[in-house]
């Protein structure tokens, strides 16, 4: 049994969906009605990710969806709301955001790979194997930092590499749960360093 009951999960999904929709409606004033289509797409794919007749997460699409819905869409939409345009220069930052957040999904799928394989959940780690999952975790974090060479997120790399070494050493089991917290902290640090680097570059 998991830590969260199905009823609590449904309640949590409903509350977070309503909160996200409320925030999105507030942004329509600044970004225009076209943002409504973006919001609807986000809600639709959030549902299709693990629900519906063919859950995308069970078909190995999770990592690609993270790049789109945690990278290109939020970064692009944020830029659009503030400037009214989405220049091509936004793409590297958007990809970096998607890659660094994907490290959390990769680690989660790495931890659950054996159970996922038994239940028919064909994540990228299940399809490619544990060693490939370890390499993807390392590459995603380092790739995100490489896309921001002129900015501060390079300081994130040593922490990410240290987390990767622990991941390889642990291999499997509940001890990987603590590494999820470490990876989340590293993602937060990456975001703060990126924001600070952009702010300093504009000075």
Regions found by a protein language model. Give the residues of each.
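Alpha-helical membrane-inserting segments
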Residues: 23-27, 77-81, 104, 147, ...
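Alpha-helical transmembrane segments
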Residues: 89-103, 115, 130-171
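Extended hydrophobic alpha-helices typical of membrane-associated regions
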Residues: 150-203
């Amino acid at each position: 049994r998991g830590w969260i009951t199905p009823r609590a999960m449904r309640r949590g999904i409903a509350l977070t969906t309503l909160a996200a929709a409320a925030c999105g409606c507030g942004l329509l004033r600044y970004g225009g009605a076209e943002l409504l289509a973006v919001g609807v797409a986000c809600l639709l794919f959030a549902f299709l990710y693990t629900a519906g007749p063919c859950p995308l997460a069970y078909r190995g699409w999770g990592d690609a969806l993270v790049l789109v819905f945690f990278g290109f869409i939020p970064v692009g939409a944020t830029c659009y709301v503030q400037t009214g345009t989405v220049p091509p220069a936004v793409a590297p930052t958007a990809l970096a955001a998607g890659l660094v957040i994907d490290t959390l999904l990769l680690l989660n799928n790495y931890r659950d790979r054996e159970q996922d394989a038994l239940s028919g959940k064909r994540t990228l780690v299940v399809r490619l194997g544990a060693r490939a999952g370890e390499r993807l975790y390392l590459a995603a974090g380092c790739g995100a930092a490489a896309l921001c060479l002129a900015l501060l997120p390079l300081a994130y790399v040593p922490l990410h590499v240290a987390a990767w070494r622990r991941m390889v050493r642990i291999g499997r089991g509940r001890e990987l749960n603590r590494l999820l917290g470490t990876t989340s902290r590293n993602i937060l640090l990456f975001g703060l360093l990126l924001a600070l680097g952009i702010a300093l570059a504009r000075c």
